[in-house]
UniProtKB/Swiss-Prot annotation:
One of its GO terms (biological process) is translation. The gene is rpsR. The keyword Ribosomal protein applies. This is Small ribosomal subunit protein bS18. InterPro entries: Ribosomal_bS18, Ribosomal_bS18_sf. It comes from the Bacteria. SUPFAM superfamilies: Ribosomal protein S18.
């Protein structure tokens, strides 16, 4: 039988920084929860708490609606650092 993987405990970046509100215009806060294709990453990968994950999701959806963050990225346009040009 294969051995179980041991993962290190992930901590919420937003609770450590004591952030009350996540603004949709602040892309530097949102980049921790986005993949290289601008998909919202799940809590188990980012380590954010439930409260902040809901706030981040809402802020990302608002930023997409305001055209600050793109909805989708083609395979050709995938970059290593998605926030270089912003």
């Amino acid at each position: 039988m294969a051995e179980k993987r041991k993962y290190s405990r992930k901590y919420c970046k937003y609770t450590e920084a004591k952030i009350d509100f996540i603004d949709y215009k602040d892309t530097s806060l949102l980049k921790y929860c986005l993949s290289e294709r601008f998909k919202i990453m799940p809590r188990r990968l980012t380590g954010t708490s439930k409260k902040y994950q809901e706030m981040v999701e809402k802020a990302i959806k608002r930023a997409r609606h305001a055209a600050i963050i793109p909805y989708i990225v083609d395979r050709k346009d995938v970059v290593t650092n998605p926030f270089e040009g912003i």
